[in-house]
Amino acid sequence: MTSWNFVCLSLGSNLGNRHEHIRRAYASLKKAGIRNLKSSVILETKALLLEGAPKEWDLPYFNSVVIGETQLSPDELIEEIKMIESRFGQDASLKWGPRPIDIDVLFYGDEAFSYHSDKCTIPHPKVLERPFLLSMIASLCPYRRFRLEGSSCNGKTFAELAAIYPLTEEDALGSFGSATQIMGIVNITDNSISDTGLFLEARRAAAHAERLFAEGASIIDLGAQATNPRVKDLGSVEQEWERLEPVLRLLAERWGAAQQCPDVSIDTFRPEIIRRAVEVFPIRWINDVSGGSLEMAHLAKEFGLRLLINHSCSLPPRPDCVLSYEESPIEQMLRWGESQLEQFAQVGLDTSWQVVFDPGIGFGKTPVQSMLLMDGVKQFKRVLECPVLIGHSRKSCLSMLGRFNSNDRDWETIGCSVSLHDRGVDYLRVHQVEGNRRALAAAAWAGMFV
């Protein structure tokens, strides 16, 4: 029987949606049969460039380290890694150039294992030159020893190596939790409960989207029609498009040729808005607050988009139209989710990744029901077998914790975000990106989620 061997890999990305590329690479490694995978935090670092490299290659990297166990030999593992990289459109001829994903084998087997072929060298010959790697390795296996005959570091633990070659403030540009991505909210409306009227002007909305991306959002959700309980008139398609179109055109100018950019999501329940949007900007997500109509599912299939299905008992939500009090809200949402996913699978969507489930915190749920639904993330992921997003940011259910206006609930939002990350949520939709991103990274670094 083939034995299982320890493996330590580094993952890096400095093109496109870097956080999403790290996530996809991690999922691909699991599919390749690497078991018991654990990830470090993601650190953003400056690019390491050869002298004379083009200036346009100077793009910051997202880096993480993963450990696990594999039955593949070193050469077989390298071949698997090359296949994964090729699926990202990797140009192998650009050595040291920008890339959507770069996966290196750092260590393999027991501590004394060394290997050299035309495909790889183990231990990785550059590992001691990269303090950010040593820091991440030490967070996962601090007492494993570095073994390399002739090296002054031979026999030292990674905990000690991380102290000898410390990660400095200049080395780390930022940090991110590896498991959960953040969707930043841009409300292009005059009647939202939060940020109302702040981003009606297209240039302000586009600038806010850029700021949220800079703060750590890997997805930007643009909404030009409010659907909160205070809304009486949902307005027309033309009114919604009049607000959304100029923002999309500005972002197309700014991100169209950008080498690093987020995914863009459109928050709408109107298929016509999606049809118009794809003509203006290469959007990646549909955020359907109506729960995912079949027409929206067909659009997701046609254009290769991800479909976020947000449950709501009514549109706009009404206080007299909520989930049943006689049954667990989690069970009610599971039935609804299973029914929706079955329909979307028949349309041809891959529900394991293309459909994202959102139980709709505050949309036809009491504060207690919303609290219970946030506690149900693990059940949703286990039963539905699809990604889960929670949109709890500044919601009225948080008023149970104190009398704060909607724009002053970010502390409560962040506290819930940390708890949701611990439950394995895939995406968090929030207004205040930087605070959530920093809190999740700190919690991950402290060992809560690695």
Swiss-Prot record:
One of its GO terms (cellular component) is cytosol. Mg(2+) binds at residue 187. Residues 182-450 are annotated as: DHPS. Keywords: ATP-binding, Folate biosynthesis, Kinase, Magnesium, Metal-binding, Multifunctional enzyme, Nucleotide-binding, Transferase. (7,8-dihydropterin-6-yl)methyl diphosphate binds at residues 227, 267, 287, 358, 395, 429-431. GO terms for molecular function: 2-amino-4-hydroxy-6-hydroxymethyldihydropteridine diphosphokinase activity; ATP binding; dihydropteroate synthase activity; kinase activity; metal ion binding. It catalyses: 6-hydroxymethyl-7,8-dihydropterin + ATP = (7,8-dihydropterin-6-yl)methyl diphosphate + AMP + H(+); (7,8-dihydropterin-6-yl)methyl diphosphate + 4-aminobenzoate = 7,8-dihydropteroate + diphosphate. Residues 180-441 form the Pterin-binding domain. Pfam families: HPPK, Pterin_bind. Its EC number is 2.7.6.3, 2.5.1.15. Its cofactor is Mg(2+). The keyword Ribosomal protein does not apply. SUPFAM superfamilies: 6-hydroxymethyl-7,8-dihydropterin pyrophosphokinase, HPPK (SSF55083), Dihydropteroate synthetase-like (SSF51717). Pathway: Cofactor biosynthesis; tetrahydrofolate biosynthesis; 2-amino-4-hydroxy-6-hydroxymethyl-7,8-dihydropteridine diphosphate from 7,8-dihydroneopterin triphosphate: step 4/4; Cofactor biosynthesis; tetrahydrofolate biosynthesis; 7,8-dihydrofolate from 2-amino-4-hydroxy-6-hydroxymethyl-7,8-dihydropteridine diphosphate and 4-aminobenzoate: step 1/2. PROSITE patterns: DHPS_1, DHPS_2, HPPK, PTERIN_BINDING. It comes from the Bacteria. In the C-terminal section; belongs to the DHPS family. In the N-terminal section; belongs to the HPPK family. NCBIfam families: DHPS (TIGR01496), folK (TIGR01498). This is Folate synthesis bifunctional protein. The gene is folKP.
